[in-house]
Design a protein with these regions (language model features):
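Short helix-initiation/N-cap motifs at beta->coil->alpha
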Residues: 63-65, 80-91, 137, 172-186
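Ligand-binding cleft/hinge of the Venus flytrap
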Residues: 43-55, 68-76, 155-176, 181, ...
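Periplasmic-binding protein-like
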Residues: 34-35, 123-130, 204-245, 262-266
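Flexible hinge/capping segments at coil-to-helix
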Residues: 48-49, 132-149
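Hydrophobic/proline-rich hinge and linker segments of small-molecule sensing/allosteric domains
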Residues: 29-41, 117-139, 229-231
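Extracytoplasmic small-molecule ligand-binding "clamshell" domains
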Residues: 24-104, 113
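Ligand-binding clefts/hinges and TM-proximal coupling segments of bilobed small-molecule sensing domains
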Residues: 157-171, 243-266
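A ligand-binding cleft/hinge motif common to bilobed small-molecule-binding domains
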Residues: 88, 104-113, 161-164, 190-223
Length: 266
């Protein structure tokens, strides 16, 4: 019995050592979908400053990736992207698989119950993407979508904004924006709510799409419109991360986003 106890104790120490080593190595493991251009996407080479995706021969790039590189540099680490589904990001962070989430994530009150957030590194504007030749192509206000079948991404604040489109039909939330684009093109939906950079990306990729912006747009909480870095609550590097973000001015953020929109895959 004593030998069994000692063996188990040794195994626990060994496991603890591996966990510490994983956290203490040269890499900063960043979680993202790598499927939400221009914030993050997957590509086959390291062109335009892309970062390796762990466990694959592919690379990630986009606005989030470039922010991740600057944060990693400030922490004396090398960035390494861990491709993770949206709903799996927070569990992966809290379990220690990720060091940080840099994935276009808003610091909502609900998420703050589980993880900590840095200062904002981008502020988003919600828009609606429709078919250029569709019934809602000339929409000007939130009241111009009566009868429209509208959706957005599951688990994202954008989906809750559908109720602000007067008379619109709230369709089932979808897993990612690639699904939404396909559904829009095929006529399954009449439109979806997105953030301006993603909608611009969709327009560039498909000439059949049209982005609808509003002079008086959605009523959005500041915590939803801003995007921040997700970290574990006990991570003592938060101050360093905030210092790195502070060095990126609002002007630089806009310039970087415009550059990523140009570089994104079509």
């Amino acid at each position: 019995m004593k030998k069994l106890f000692l063996s188990l104790f040794a195994l626990l120490l060994l496991s603890f050592g591996f966990a510490n080593r994983a956290q203490a190595d040269e890499y900063l493991r960043i979680g993202m979908e790598a499927a939400y251009a221009p914030f993050n996407w997957t590509q086959d080479d390291d062109k335009n400053g892309a970062v390796k995706i762990e466990g694959t021969n592919q690379y990630a790039n986009g606005y989030d990736v470039q922010i991740a590189k600057q944060v990693a540099k400030a922490l004396g680490k090398k960035p390494l992207v861990v491709k993770t589904s949206w709903n799996g990001l927070i569990p992966a962070l809290t379990s220690g698989k990720l060091d940080m989430i840099i994935a276009g994530m808003s610091p909502t009150a609900e998420r703050k119950k589980e993880i900590a957030f840095s200062n904002s590194y981008y502020t988003s504007e919600p828009v609606v993407l429709v078919n250029k030749d569709g019934a809602y192509a000339n929409a000007k206000t939130l009241k111009d979508f009566k009868g429209a079948k509208i959706t957005s991404q599951q688990g994202v604040y954008l989906y809750n904004l559908i109720s602000q489109l007067t008379g619109a039909k709230q369709e089932t939330a979808m897993g990612d924006f690639a699904q939404m684009r396909q559904a829009l093109e095929s006529g399954v939906i009449d439109g979806y709510i997105s953030e301006r950079p993603e909608a611009l990306t969709a327009e560039s990729a498909n000439s059949k799409f049209k982005m609808i912006q509003f002079k008086k747009g959605f009523d959005v909480n500041e915590e939803d419109a801003t995007i921040a870095i997700g970290m574990r609550k006990n991570d003592k590097r938060l101050e360093q991360v905030n210092a790195a973000i502070t060095k990126i001015s609002a002007k630089d953020q806009v310039a970087l986003m415009d550059k990523m929109i140009q570089n994104q895959p079509v």
